[in-house]
Regions:
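Conserved metal-binding segment of the jelly-roll/cupin
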Residues: 135, 141-162, 168-173, 276, ...
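Contiguous mid-protein beta-loop-alpha structural module that forms a pocket-lining wall or clamp
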Residues: 148-205
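Conserved GNAT-family N-acetyltransferase fold
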Residues: 104, 272, 315
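A short beta-loop-beta micro-motif enriched in histidine and acidic residues
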Residues: 89-100, 107-121, 137, 259-268, ...
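C-terminal structured domain segments across diverse proteins
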Residues: 258-260, 267-273, 283-286, 296, ...
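A short, N-terminal "cap"/entry segment at the start of jelly-roll beta-barrel domains
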Residues: 2-96, 186, 193-266, 270
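A short hydrophobic beta-strand segment most commonly corresponding to one strand
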Residues: 104, 122-124, 149, 163-182, ...
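A short beta-strand-loop-beta hairpin characteristic of the jelly-roll/cupin
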Residues: 107-144, 150-154, 159, 284-311
Length: 355
């Protein structure tokens, strides 16, 4: 007589859960897993993330950064940074699942030694004057609001010959490069790389609505590495009285002048103006974004919480979180995300409104 089998595939009279558990234990020893047990989690109907909205207040981070300057030198640390770790991603040293962010301090007289790595990096100057970043043989003086690019595998170092501490926001694609198994880093023979070009050379050569005759873009990386805030701010305020986006106010994206694309292949960067009295419509997108308040203050309304951020504060909005921006005064926000990756893979989505 043959055993009668029910539709679930187990013999009549037996406990299917016990049979399945025994089966799962057997296949686990062969490094096999049943997809049907995890399919809903692996392929959800909408984005799911462990990251949560979070705020880092300048009144908290600035004193702690200065304390770090008394505890360890820039040379000892190589990069003296306090990581903005998302509380939903504790222990992962990251702000979003794909974007690392941190606040870096360099004191007067210090040099953060030259190195290079396969991760692309950005610097957004938050506080202080007189420091510099050197990238690929050219130095640029750093001022608050400046956006600076360190392309992958280019030598870069930082120094502060000025008289005051300088703090900037770092953003890197560390998690993306780690996921791809392509992490490399190399130290320079000297603390400071040799300067081969005068300051402003790249900006004049590639950022003046012209390109050198015969120039060919390389690797999708911007040929200029400094985007001065004075120019970017002037553009925003020139557009203040014109049409504005109902969710973002006046929002502009930084571009590679050679291609019109993002300055870096993996990180998109943006600057936006919320005019005084602005109350934005609800918005969400698949790229989680890190924000820095440059001027003014902003109230961010999310479905389950509110963030009130002022000058030099940083905050993060995870993927597919619906939010609204409100500003009582003219407010400028810098932000960055992994949007270029999502666009290249045809994954990026956005939605305006409540529905």
């Amino acid at each position: 007589m043959h055993a009668r089998v029910n539709p679930a595939g187990s013999a009549a009279g037996t406990d299917p859960s016990a049979a399945r558990s025994a089966y799962y234990e057997r296949i686990a020893r062969l490094n096999l897993k049943p997809l049907w047990e995890v399919l809903a989690a692996l392929v959800p109907p909408a984005p799911v993330t462990d990251a949560v909205p979070a705020l880092w207040r300048w009144q908290d981070t600035q004193p702690l950064l200065m304390e770090s300057g008394r505890l360890i030198t820039a040379r000892e640390a190589e990069r003296r940074v306090l990581i903005l770790e998302n509380p939903g991603l504790a222990g992962q040293f990251t702000c979003t699942p794909t974007i690392y962010a941190g606040l870096q301090l360099i004191l007067p007289g210090e040099v953060a030694p030259a190195h290079r790595h396969t991760q692309s990096a950005l610097r957004f100057v938050v506080d202080g004057e007189g420091a510099y970043t050197a990238v690929d043989g050219e130095r640029v003086t750093m001022s608050p609001g400046d956006f600076i690019v360190t392309p992958m595998w280019t030598w870069h170092d930082h120094g502060n010959p000025g008289g005051e501490p300088v703090i900037w926001l770092d953003g890197l694609d560390i998690q993306v490069v780690r996921l791809l198994g392509a992490q490399f880093r190399d130290g320079h023979d000297s603390d400071s790389q040799s300067v081969a070009r005068p300051e402003g050379d790249a900006l004049a050569r590639y950022g003046s609505n012209m390109l050198p005759d015969g120039f060919a873009p390389r690797n999708g990386v911007t040929p200029i590495f400094s985007y001065p805030y004075r120019q970017s701010r002037a553009a925003l305020f020139a557009l203040k009285e014109g049409p504005r986006h109902r969710c973002h106010g006046v929002k502009m994206r930084y571009v590679n002048p050679a291609t019109g694309g993002a300055p870096m292949p993996t990180i998109g960067t943006f600057l936006q103006l919320l005019p005084a009295g602005f109350s934005g419509a609800p918005y969400r997108s698949t790229d989680a974004a890190v924000f820095s308040v440059v001027e003014g203050s902003v109230r961010v309304e999310l479905d389950d919480r509110r963030i009130d951020a002022g000058p030099k504060d940083q905050f993060v909005i995870p993927s597919w979180y619906r939010y609204r921006l409100h500003a009582a005064e003219d407010t400028v926000l810098f932000s960055f995300s992994d949007r270029p990756i999502q666009l290249a893979l045809h994954l990026w989505r956005e939605h305006e409104g409540d529905a």
